[in-house]
C-alpha cells in the first residue's frame, strides 16, 4: 500500500501535535532568548524531550522508543520548530541522522546497546558527514572504516559535526 493511499488516524496525530506544542511552550519558549544570547546548547531540554518520547519517535517500543511513524514525526518536529527551529532541528537530526540509522542498519548488539539510551534522551546522537576537503559530498569522502579482527578502525577527519563537541 502506498503512503498516498494509506489511511492515517488524524485525531491521534492531532493529539501528538498538541502534546508537542504543549512541550515546546512549557520547556522551550521561556528560555529561547537566553539560550540564544548565551550560546547555550540545552541538553536538559533534549532529555526532557526523551521523557515525552520525542527522542525515539521512529524507534519501536521494544527498544524504548515511541514506535510512531513519519506523519507523527513531522507533526512533532513542526510544532517544536514553530517555537525554536534549532531545537526542532536537533531533535530531527537525533531521530533521523543517528537513531534511525542505527535502528535500520545497526546490528542487534547496536540496537541493544544504543537505542534505549538514544530513544529516552539519555544519550544524544551525533552525525559526522562533512570533511575539510570535500564538504558534505558523501561520494568524495576520504575517511575510511576498516575491519581489524572484531573491531573497526576509523581513519579520517570530520568537521561541523552535528551535536559534536
Question: What are the residue ranges of the model-derived segments?
Answer:
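Conserved short loop/turn motifs at secondary-structure junctions
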Residues: 34-38, 61-65, 98-104, 130-133
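Amphipathic, small/basic residue-rich leader segments at the start of a protein or domain
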Residues: 1-92, 109-113, 117-120, 124, ...
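Surface-exposed beta-strand edges and their flanking turn/coil or helix-capping segments
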Residues: 61, 70, 102-104, 139-142
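Short alpha-helix boundary/capping motifs
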Residues: 52, 77, 104-108, 130, ...
Amino acid at each position: 500500500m502506498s503512503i498516498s493511499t494509506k489511511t492515517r488516524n488524524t485525531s491521534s496525530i492531532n493529539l501528538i501535535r498538541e502534546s508537542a506544542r504543549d512541550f515546546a511552550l512549557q520547556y522551550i519558549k521561556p528560555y529561547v532568548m537566553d539560550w540564544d544570547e548565551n550560546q547555550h546548547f540545552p541538553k536538559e531540554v533534549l532529555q526532557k524531550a526523551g521523557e515525552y518520547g520525542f527522542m525515539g519517535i521512529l524507534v519501536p517500543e521494544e527498544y524504548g522508543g515511541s514506535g510512531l511513524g513519519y506523519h507523527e514525526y513531522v507533526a512533532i518536529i513542526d510544532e517544536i520548530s514553530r517555537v525554536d527551529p534549532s531545537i526542532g532541528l536537533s531533535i530531527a537530526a537525533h531521530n533521523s541522522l543517528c537513531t534511525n540509522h542505527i535502528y535500520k542498519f545497526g546490528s542487534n548488539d547496536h540496537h541493544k546497546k544504543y537505542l534505549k539510551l538514544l530513544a529516552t534522551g539519555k544519550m544524544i546522537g551525533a552525525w559526522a558527514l562533512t570533511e575539510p576537503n570535500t564538504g558534505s559530498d558523501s561520494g568524495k569522502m576520504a575517511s575510511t572504516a576498516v575491519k581489524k579482527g572484531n573491531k573497526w578502525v576509523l581513519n579520517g577527519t570530520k568537521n561541523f559535526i552535528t551535536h559534536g563537541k
